[in-house]
Swiss-Prot record:
L-aspartate binds at K98, R183, R238. GO terms for biological process: 'de novo' pyrimidine nucleobase biosynthetic process; 'de novo' UMP biosynthetic process; amino acid metabolic process. Belongs to the aspartate/ornithine carbamoyltransferase superfamily. ATCase family. GO terms for molecular function: amino acid binding; aspartate carbamoyltransferase activity. This is Aspartate carbamoyltransferase catalytic subunit. Its EC number is 2.1.3.2. Coiled coil: none annotated. InterPro entries: Asp/Orn_carbamoyltranf_P-bd (IPR006132), Asp/Orn_carbamoylTrfase (IPR006130), Asp/Orn_carbamoylTrfase_sf (IPR036901), Asp_carbamoyltransf (IPR002082), Asp_carbamoyltransf_Asp/Orn-bd (IPR006131). It comes from Marinomonas sp. (strain MWYL1). The lineage of its organism: Bacteria, Pseudomonadati, Pseudomonadota, Gammaproteobacteria, Oceanospirillales. PROSITE patterns: CARBAMOYLTRANSFERASE. GO terms for cellular component: cytosol.
Length: 334
């Protein structure tokens, strides 16, 4: 069976989202629609009743095969604020721990008339595989798959940047740390280039910043000062030791000495630069507490914006499913 192209698999025949698997193939119009819709949801956090009925009567299943705090919780909050019923599958106590295959687990959940799966998995391409094998009327949202993609994280980062900088025009952005193992960096780079940012710098040691990222439109910097010089946005990434094989860096202390973001190294960026981090933060490894908690940090804003972005993506995907000619109901009407 041939693997579907990302754009063809993610959009219905009207060009609307029906799955959200990767930013690869999605154009500026769709990304901007996600940001605009998320902006409209942000004000809900200030209301006494933080709900809208857009997913009322729908069942959302969180399938997290990797540990998560922020992503799983914000997806659950987003679904509940859209009035959906939410099921959090405990993978450790589910039948998958007894040897049941991923596909069999999904087919059983489909039989329970689930409407949307939020999937995090250690294997790259897992969300794509699920979208290809699920019934057409179930929406699949990728909450992170291996090194491949983390599209909702990238979009909440884009919303954070836009809200603090106004637009993406002329911005200089540095992404610092373990680029090699980061699905976040890959999705961020796709989003930034699609939204028109031409100066994106990937900063870190040669072992963690492969040269092939230049083909995606980034500038590679192995010197922190050169990477941070006059940038508007600094995105710090943690060292993903759980994915590392072999000696990719001498030590955490050496990494911090060469690439850690401190008040001194942040001074190389613009005076009004913002500092971002997708979490979890390792203080004293990639970032100092003074910077993480300082006036330039928008890290907690990212978490807040994540709820709104995930509400936007989930509501758009469900709407795209309902308007798709591929749904069983639509086929019955023909």
């Amino acid at each position: 069976m041939m693997r579907s192209e990302p754009r063809a698999l993610q959009l219905n025949e009207h060009g609307q989202l029906k799955h959200f698997l990767t930013l690869d193939g999605l154009d500026k119009t769709i990304l901007t629609e996600i940001l605009d819709r998320a902006d409209s949801f942000l004000s809900m956090g200030e209301q006494s009743v933080k709900k809208v009925p857009l997913l009322r009567g729908k069942t959302v299943v969180n399938l997290f095969f990797e540990n998560s705090t922020r992503t799983r919780t914000t997806f659950e909050l987003a679904a509940k604020r859209l009035s959906a019923d939410v099921i959090n599958l405990n993978i450790e106590t589910s039948a998958t721990s007894k040897g049941e295959s991923l596909l069999d687990t999904l087919k059983n959940l489909e039989a329970m008339q689930s409407d949307m799966f939020i999937v995090r998995h250690s294997d790259s391409g897992a969300a794509h595989f699920i979208a290809e094998h699920c019934t057409p009327n179930v929406a699949i949202i990728n909450a992170g798959d291996g090194r491949h993609a983390h599209p909702t994280q990238a979009m909440l980062d884009m919303l954070t940047i836009r809200r603090h900088k106004g637009s993406f025009d002329g911005l200089k952005i540095a992404i610092v740390g373990d680029i090699l193992h980061s699905r976040v960096a890959r999705s961020q780079l796709q989003a930034l280039t699609t939204l028109g940012v031409s100066d994106v710098r990937l900063v870190g040691p040669k072992t963690l910043v492969p040269s092939f990222f230049e083909e995606m439109g980034a500038t590679i910097c192995h010197d922190l000062e050169a990477g941070l010089k006059d940038v508007d946005v600094v995105v710090m990434l943690r060292l993903q030791k759980e994915r590392m094989k072999g000696a990719l860096l001498p030590s955490e202390s050496e990494f911090y000495r060469l690439y850690g973001l401190t008040e001194e190294t942040l001074a190389w960026a613009k005076p009004d630069a913002i500092v971002m981090h997708p979490g979890p933060i390792n203080r004293g490894v990639e970032i100092s507490s003074e910077v993480a908690d300082g006036k330039h940090s928008v890290i907690l804003n990212q978490v807040t914006n994540g709820i709104a972005v995930r509400m936007a993506v989930m509501s758009m995907a469900m709407s795209g499913q309902l308007q798709s000619d591929e749904t069983p109901a639509a086929k019955d009407e023909k």
